[in-house]
Amino acid sequence: DFTNDLKIKSISSSSHSSKWSPTFGEEKNILNEYNKMKVLLSKDSLEMLLLFKIFNDGVAFKYDVPNQKHIISYDIIDEKSEFNLSSDDKAWWIPAFSYRRYEFLHAFSSVDSISKKYFSENVEDITYDSLGIDAAHTPFTLKKKNGFYVSIHEANLVNYSSMTLAPKGDGATPLGPKGDEVTPLGPKGDEVSPLGPKGDG
């Protein structure tokens, strides 16, 4: 359980600058420039890395379980990460957990209004076509009260299930997966069963 009583063992930082060329797109070269911070956390005899990459126009984070003698394999049974958003934030979103299709027209509402009921009343009736909790898929784009726009999305899904965003009220929006609202990837019905540590990327 890495949700409490964690200790910071070390913090390191570095910078990176390179270019890469996309196969398609408007730009020939894309500048890949960021500052990186690695925070090594520990609890009892276990360790976990929290990695941040800060770009000029965004921030990325991920958790990583480094190679260690106490862990051969592990199961992830819940995800506790959250984005603490303002109740004043408005969002373009589509509903998660539709079993017939993935793509919809977007709803535009407050973060706290994300629900199958709201979507059915204002965009398209999905009451016949949905499972699980009220949640939104990513990409999830916000319009802040100050006029700024923020998008939340996922990347680099290796041995991990995709993310959904579920409102908790007062703007708090936890990351999925949550409990039995995802299709189990592990043989024991766990949410995610990675094969083992993969390095800190």
Predicted features along the sequence, with ranges:
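N-terminal accessory beta-strand-rich subdomains and adjacent acidic, glycine-rich linkers
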Residues: 1-201
